[in-house]
Amino acid sequence: MLRSVSPPGLTAMTMRDLEEVLESRSRALTAAKWIYGPRAWSSVMPSTVPGVSPQAWERVRATRRVADVRVAETASSADGTIKLLIALDGGAIETVMIPSSARSTICVSSQIGCTRTCKFCATATLGFGRNLLADEIVAQYLIARMLAPEQAPAKNVVFMGMGEPMDNLDEVLIAVEVLTQSPAPQLGHAQVTVSTSGVLPGMRRFLAESRGSLALSLNGSTDAQRTALMPQTKTWPIGDLLDLLRTDRSTHPKRIHFIEYVMFDGVNDTDDDARRVVDLLAGINARVNLIPHNPIATSPLRSATGDRIDGFHQVLVGAGVRCMIRSPRGQDIAAACGQLAHVRTR
């Protein structure tokens, strides 16, 4: 479900949109630098923009609106992660700023709630509210990047917050185009990653229409495992999903494919599972992220032990698979993978 909104949003304007409305390439460049440049967020449409004539800017004011979003709550983790509860029309979402030594990552949401029912994800317990608009997605980045440490600017965006991006693909594709356009925000295509639980038609369209990176939440070495954890994935078998990545690898060799594998104790964490994953990924050259399960109140699932995760990692690396073990970030404020559900931490 997508709201019918008129006029469309200011922070969903591509360079093509700006040139069309402002009737000038140079004015469009100036406006883009200002709209997407580093400044405090405001939901009020500016009356003027430096370097753009009032008459030209009035055409933008007459045809666009500013996303009505505001930060309702901020929570800070001991590891530097910051979670934002962002209020908007029809509900609220969560956005996370994750700092590292050299750059920060902004984790954005694509829906209020989620259309999927993954057993290990807190967002699934919220049900589905609505799809976000492209300007609301981009606004999350513009707001959260201002919280990044000066020595670690926000250079990465991951669509791994609330929602299934492939179920809101029209708006996600616009947001990815805006985030990667020059002169601003000017993120690299490899630095924008869209995650999916495995919606094959959406994946196919995303790979055809975007240069962004794709992350597939695999989370099982067999279809039976995967369906038990993610019931709505039964429509598209693992083999079909990975065949698509294999085909895309042959036509777009520079694109990065990520395989996300959340590890659960006694469910998907054996050496046999690891060997099956190696076989499944043959010919894809994907980067595998092993993710310890972050606990949520509504699920009895437990994370695999550190030793089991290490053993799984060794099997994959020994077979030549590029693989990393991801450390939980923001777990103490319910900001880690699978924990986003408006949980108050204070």
Annotate the PLM regions.
Residues M146-M324:
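Conserved AdoMet/S-adenosylmethionine-binding subsite of the radical SAM
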Residues M1-G90, P149, R246-I256, Y261-R346:
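Auxiliary Fe-S-binding modules of radical SAM enzymes
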Residues D89-I93, A102-S104:
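Short acidic/polar mixed-charge low-complexity motifs
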Residues T74-S77, S109-S110, S195, S217:
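Short linear Ser/Thr-Pro motifs
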Residues L84, T95, I106-V108, L216:
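Short beta-strand motif preference
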Residues P99-A139, I143, E150:
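Canonical Radical SAM [4Fe-4S] cluster-binding loop centered on the CxxxCxxC motif
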